[in-house]
Every structure is written in C-alpha cells, then in structure tokens.
C-alpha cells in the first residue's frame, strides 16, 4: 500500500494526523499550520501584543511553556512583533519535581538567549509546597498553589518590569476550566476563563496564545522539533479537582474530537447580565501586602496567616475577612509594587535578570509512544 500523501502539499508523505481537523499532513506542513494558527490567534481583533512590549513567558519546563517559548521566539522574528521576551519561572518548592523541571527551563534559556527570572515560594511566602502539604494534606493543596502561583507570577513580572505575561494554557486546559466552572456553578468565571487576554485596570495583562491549540498537537510539535522538556506530572496533582474534568473531557474527545473547541465556544457565549455584574465585588488592594483583592485581605495573605497559625485546611476560611496586622511573629508577604505604571507610561524598571549560566543536572526528555 503506497504511503498517504500530505493533504496540503500533496507531495511529501503524511506523518501526522491532526487531532483537531483529521487532516493527514507532512512534518513541514504541520509546523507551518500550527505556527500560523498561533499567529492568527495573536493578531485576531486588536491583537494580543503591542509593539515594544516587554513580555514574560511563564516557563515551567513542561511541554506547553517550552513550545510556547520556541514558537513565540520564531513568530517574533518572522512577523516582526517587536517584543522583548523574558522567561519567568516560579519555584513552588516541590522536591523531585520542580527542582528538576527548572533545569529544563535553564536549558531553554541558554538555547533561546532569553533573560530568566526565578522566584520561589520560599523567598516570597516563607513556605514551600512540600511544607504546606505536610500541614494541610494532599486533598486541597492545589488551592494554595494556585493562589500563591498567580500572585508570584505578577510579582515576578513586576520585578522584571514587564507589561505582559503569556502562559502555555492550551485548548484542553481551557475546556477543562469551563467544565470545572460549570460543575462548581461559577457563572462569573465562565466567560472570563475563555478570553485570550485578561486585564483589569489594576492588573498585569495576561494572554493565552495557545487558546485553540490542542494538547496532542503541542506534544507532536515538541516531538518533531526535538524540543527538550520535562514530562513528569506534579506529584501532588492526582488528587486535584481538575483531574475529574480532564477524564470527562478525554472521554468526550474520543467520541467527538471537536468537543474541546465546542466547549470553549460555549464558554465564550456566556455573558453576565448587567444586574449580576453590578452585584460583583469591586477590586481593591490588600491592606496587608498591597496586592489586588476583592476583600480587605487577599487570598494569599489569608492562606498564609492560616499556615502561620498552624490551622488545618478547614479552619483557614476564618482568616479571609481579617483586616488587622499580621499576628506577631508571623511571616508576611512583601508589599506589592508595579514597575510599569497603570496608565501606560512605564516607570523605570529594575535591571532585567541576568542569563543563567550552566546547567547542573541532566535534563529529561520525553518520547511519544
């Protein structure tokens, strides 16, 4: 039986069957359509980027952020976006996981020549995820990590003096988030979670260039490009609530491959009525650390106070409404400062992080099986 020709160029042998479209394409055509689709997501409407922006790529060393760093570097040169790109990594303090994945980030930094900033939970909060799990257990530890990580990214971006954070959230991730918000009845977040770009007047802009990129295609891109990335799942994630949505989504995808994009489009169609929007809490600044919050005390400060007090997960909610200074002897989060002004006129940023030299450990790679 003769080999199947590429459905796009009709000359080379097809090596990839795209999960999203079912097209059978050759390797070079796959690279072209994948990169073009990401570019189209970036420039659609008013566009994600503005020329001259300083953009931090949230880099974990995993497949999504590794491919994102590679593709953005390529597209920035090909289409002359005029961006200053940086790598921003958060060290949650998970032994045997994050310490190894950061070595992959360092290799990516050396390969692409991008400045790298690493900010740790230990440095910022005085706690590592290993210590947090020791105290609260594995059942709800992702709540802590999600809250702490989001604030750490904003603080790292402020230290770099960047205008914009991009993350490797892919179509599967976004569809899972839509399902989670439906299952939790969180209507307010449904439309927001599907947006390519989110920003309020008090927050650093965040974007998801891989909004329509399927996870399987990201893996195939990394494989055929021979990109090095860290493949191990977080050791604390098997008990995460997101896992249930992921299993359900994979079952749907097996029956209907378009289910992922269909769910995203469903989330996009949710629009809150004005009466509901008016009833939502306005954003303010945390009285303790100065970070953005819908309460007098931000979630990170509330969770940290609970940890410092030795509270169990069930008792941590009691600290949410606290407005007083932290109890004596408790560690607190440093005051949050933006280095780029909110009105578009940048203040003088700190000196960007110096390139990281040397890779101390062997970097793991993954093969598609």
Curated annotation (Swiss-Prot):
CDD domains: CTU1-like (cd01713). GO terms for cellular component: cytosol; cytosolic tRNA wobble base thiouridylase complex; peroxisome. GO terms for molecular function: nucleotidyltransferase activity; tRNA binding; tRNA-uridine 2-sulfurtransferase activity. GO terms for biological process: protein urmylation; tRNA thio-modification; tRNA wobble position uridine thiolation; tRNA wobble uridine modification. Coiled coil: none annotated. It is found in: Cytoplasm. Its EC number is 2.7.7.-. Its main location: cytoplasm. InterPro entries: CTU1-like_ATP-bd, CTU1_C, Ncs6/Tuc1/Ctu1, Rossmann-like_a/b/a_fold, TilS/TtcA_N, tRNA_thiolation_TtcA_Ctu1. Transmembrane segments: none annotated. The keyword Cell inner membrane does not apply. PANTHER family: ATPASES OF THE PP SUPERFAMILY-RELATED, CYTOPLASMIC TRNA 2-THIOLATION PROTEIN 1. Belongs to the TtcA family. CTU1/NCS6/ATPBD3 subfamily. This is Cytoplasmic tRNA 2-thiolation protein 1. The gene is NCS6.
């Amino acid at each position: 039986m003769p080999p199947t020709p590429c459905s796009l160029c009709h000359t080379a042998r097809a090596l990839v069957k795209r999960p999203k479209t079912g097209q059978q394409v050759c390797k070079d055509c796959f690279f072209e359509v994948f990169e073009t689709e990401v570019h189209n997501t970036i420039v659609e409407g008013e566009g994600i980027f503005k020329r001259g922006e300083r953009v931090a790529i949230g880099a974990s060393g995993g497949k999504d952020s590794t491919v994102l760093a590679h593709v953005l570097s390529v597209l920035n040169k090909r289409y002359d976006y005029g961006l200053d790109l940086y790598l921003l990594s958060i060290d949650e303090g998970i032994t045997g996981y994050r310490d190894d994945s950061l070595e992959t980030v360092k290799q990516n930094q050396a390969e692409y020549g991008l400045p790298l900033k690493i900010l740790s939970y230990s440095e910022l909060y005085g706690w590592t995820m290993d210590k947090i799990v020791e105290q609260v257990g594995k059942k709800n530890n992702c709540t802590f990590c999600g809250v702490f990580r989001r604030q750490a990214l904003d603080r790292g971006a402020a230290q770099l003096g960047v205008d914009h954070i991009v993350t490797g959230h892919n179509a599967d991730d976004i569809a899972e988030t839509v399902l989670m918000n439906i299952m939790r009845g969180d209507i307010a977040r449904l439309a927001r979670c599907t947006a390519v770009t989110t920003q309020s007047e008090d927050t650093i802009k965040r974007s998801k260039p891989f909004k329509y990129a399927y996870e399987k295609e990201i893996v195939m891109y990394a494989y055929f490009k021979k990109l090095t990335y860290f493949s191990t799942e977080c050791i604390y994630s098997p008990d995460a609530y997101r896992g249930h949505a992921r299993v359900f989504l994979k079952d749907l995808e097996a029956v209907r491959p378009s289910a992922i994009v269909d769910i995203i489009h469903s989330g996009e169609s949710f629009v809150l009525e004005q009466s509901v929007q008016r009833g939502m809490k306005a954003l303010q600044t945390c009285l303790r650390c100065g970070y953005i919050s819908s309460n007098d005390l931000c979630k990170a400060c509330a969770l940290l106070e609970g940890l410092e007090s030795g509270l169990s997960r069930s008792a941590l909610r009691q600290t949410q409404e606290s407005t007083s200074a932290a109890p004596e002897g408790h560690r607190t989060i440093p005051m949050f400062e933006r280095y780029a002004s909110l009105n578009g006129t940048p203040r003088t940023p700190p000196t960007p992080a110096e390139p990281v030299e040397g890779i101390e450990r062997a970097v793991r790679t993954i093969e598609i099986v």
